[in-house]
Amino acid sequence: MESTNRLSAIQTLLVIQRWIGLLKWENEGEDGVLTWLKRIYPFVLHLPLTFTYIALMWYEAITSSDFEEAGQVLYMSITELALVTKLLNIWYRRHEAASLIHELQHDPAFNLRNSEEIKFWQQNQRNFKRIFYWYIWGSLFVAVMGYISVFFQEDYELPFGYYVPFEWRTRERYFYAWGYNVVAMTLCCLSNILLDTLGCYFMFHIASLFRLLGMRLEALKNAAEEKARPELRRIFQLHTKVRRLTRECEVLVSPYVLSQVVFSAFIICFSAYRLVHMGFKQRPGLFVTTVQFVAVMIVQIFLPCYYGNELTFHANALTNSVFGTNWLEYSVGTRKLLNCYMEFLKRPVKVRAGVFFEIGLPIFVKTINNAYSFFALLLKISK
């Protein structure tokens, strides 16, 4: 049975990512002026906005008069540093990302074969879409709150601090600085959360394929050996493909998760430090925005850890699915085939971030612990 749209959860988001210069266009390999424009478009868009804006934020942090003033900018500067890593990674591996997306969507080896599999796949896609649309809209809401909250302050203040090369604390010039802040931050925010979504989706999709393998193994529970043996061979071949996809996924998501984990502890630390020195009574709008920002940051680091953990869990669960087959009724030759498969399953499936750690829930807990340790140290130093 022909499958439905296998990438339905992110189909719209893929189009948006091409329009904001994150992914290559589908027909970018053709010749012509339009193709050339498509190739330089990401740089034309992100150089004056994303990279210039991030450079101005870091300049503001470095030239701050004291540590407390720098802390007001550093929490966002480090966040955008993680974005730079994600951007450079997806641009450097743009062909690998496009190839993986195309294979997940069009390779007939991954076609769904019956109504039960289609129902399972569609439900899974809807669940992922629901989670990440909440995450995307929640993140954008935090940014919008930041843009608006400054209008409730007595003094002129920017939503997210950066170095402005002219005097902007006047009625005539304030909205120039504020407008650039809004446009650049919106692009940064959207790029950040969509790259998060793409990385998590790759892990989610491969975890779903491992679950599909488990379903097909368990469907052989009452199957005769004549039917089960060729089906087992097809399952083994599909498993080999999914293992290869896992390695390709690791290459794409490893730098992004590594940068996110490394920087998140500092981001949460400086955000908490900013809250301590800000106070709710003095700046209620910015205080609430910063609290929301911390909540989004915690979700941002939790999601890749969760989906990496899901991938590993469902890959390892295939051992139990093998025992769900009708193996006791099989011949010696088929049992030996299953035994070889069991030996193959002993090789653990793990997605690693660099060479340092496995992507999973334990690293999320460790990141939160590190953030608290850094925060306690920062408070002690600042006294």
Curated annotation (Swiss-Prot):
Gene Ontology MF terms = ionotropic olfactory receptor activity; ligand-gated calcium channel activity; odorant binding; olfactory receptor activity
Keyword Membrane recorded: yes
Q: Which residues lie on this side of the membrane: Extracellular?
A: 63-70, 152-174, 272-284, 380-383
Just give the chief location class.
membrane
Subcellular localization, as worded in the UniProt entry? Cell membrane
Supply the InterPro entries for this chain: 7tm6_olfct_rcpt (IPR004117)
Stretches in topological domain Cytoplasmic: 1-41, 92-130, 196-250, 306-358
Q: Which GO terms describe its biological process?
A: calcium ion transmembrane transport; detection of chemical stimulus involved in sensory perception of smell
Q: Name one GO cellular component term.
A: dendrite membrane
Membrane topology, as annotated, equals: Multi-pass membrane protein
Listed transmembrane segments: 42-62, 71-91, 131-151, 175-195, 251-271, 285-305, 359-379
Say if the entry is tagged with keyword Ribosomal protein. no
For this UniProt record, give its keywords in alphabetical order, as a comma-separated list. Cell membrane, Membrane, Olfaction, Receptor, Sensory transduction, Transducer, Transmembrane, Transmembrane helix
What family is this? Belongs to the insect chemoreceptor superfamily. Heteromeric odorant receptor channel (TC 1.A.69) family. Or2a subfamily.
What quaternary structure, including any partners, is listed in this protein's UniProt entry? Interacts with Orco. Complexes exist early in the endomembrane system in olfactory sensory neurons (OSNs), coupling these complexes to the conserved ciliary trafficking pathway.
Q: What else is known?
A: The atypical heteromeric and topological design of the odorant receptors appears to be an insect-specific solution for odor recognition, making the OR/Orco complex an attractive target for the development of highly selective insect repellents to disrupt olfactory-mediated host-seeking behaviors of insect disease vectors. Odor-evoked OR currents are independent of known G-protein-coupled second messenger pathways.
PANTHER family recorded for this chain? ODORANT RECEPTOR, ODORANT RECEPTOR 46A, ISOFORM B-RELATED
What function does the entry list?
Answer: Odorant receptor which mediates acceptance or avoidance behavior, depending on its substrates. The odorant receptor repertoire encodes a large collection of odor stimuli that vary widely in identity, intensity, and duration. May form a complex with Orco to form odorant-sensing units, providing sensitive and prolonged odorant signaling and calcium permeability.
**Name of the protein this chain belongs to:** Odorant receptor 94b
Which species does this protein come from? Answer: Drosophila melanogaster (Fruit fly)
Q: Gene behind this chain?
A: Or94b
